[in-house]
Amino acid sequence: IGMETGGDQDPFNSTLERTAREIHENYQKSSPKAPSWERLSEFKRNSNRHAVLHVEIKRAVWRKQGTRTKEEILGHLTRSEHMRWMAFNTMDGWRYAPIEEQDPDHRLHPCLRPFNELNMHDKRKDAENVFHALELPIETSIPEIADSSLER
């Protein structure tokens, strides 16, 4: 799933690339074995680029909290982030496989399943993506949020 932009001189392209790199660098903080941006496949780079396009949606939802609590909104956005990620991958032919059968060459990934079936580590990755998109500090309460509002 490619991203066509107007080339290196296009301001959208440079902002998109810079922010996609930032998203990946944020991911590397919780997954130190993740490769550098330069070593990512084009598919993984495009995954980060598509995540950038969803940032404004997350921010709009965050601004319009209404009567819902911060934890409820963060839970909703975290579940939505996981669904966005799953949609991107399944549209490219990826399928679920247990962790012991994970195989990028055959497009098999253990996180391609409903959010409530993920372990806390994988839920936290989705929550950290949301916190990063909203420019909120990564809070130590992410597991608490996950326990209370992400299980619905």
What are these regions (language model features)?
Residues 1-152:
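Alpha-helical propensity feature that highlights long, continuous alpha-helices across diverse contexts
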